[in-house]
A protein has these predicted regions:
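Eukaryotic chromatin- and chromosome-associated nuclear factors
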Residues: 1-79
């Protein structure tokens, strides 16, 4: 599993960078699905940074920090 340096985790947790337009990839079972980051938000219950991903097939999903970093990394590896 991808582990970003601690200083990156602290910065992202305090103020999520928009990352709008970044491409991501996520593995669902045995199929890779691609999408783009379309926005950011903060979880009102726990204050966690969230990034909204709009998949190429039209689905939407919110990612937490560790998930979005892994998805960006996977896209880079597959490109």
């Amino acid at each position: 599993m991808f582990s970003p340096p601690l200083f990156i985790i602290i910065i992202l947790a305090q103020r999520p960078p928009p990352l709008t337009g970044y491409r991501i990839a996520k593995l669902f079972h045995t199929t890779v699905h691609y999408g783009s980051i379309s926005g950011t938000d903060v979880d009102k219950l726990n204050g966690a940074a969230l990034w909204t991903v709009n998949y190429d097939d039209g689905d939407l999903e919110d990612f937490e920090m560790d998930e979005i970093l892994a998805a960006i990394k996977l896209f880079a590896e597959l490109s």
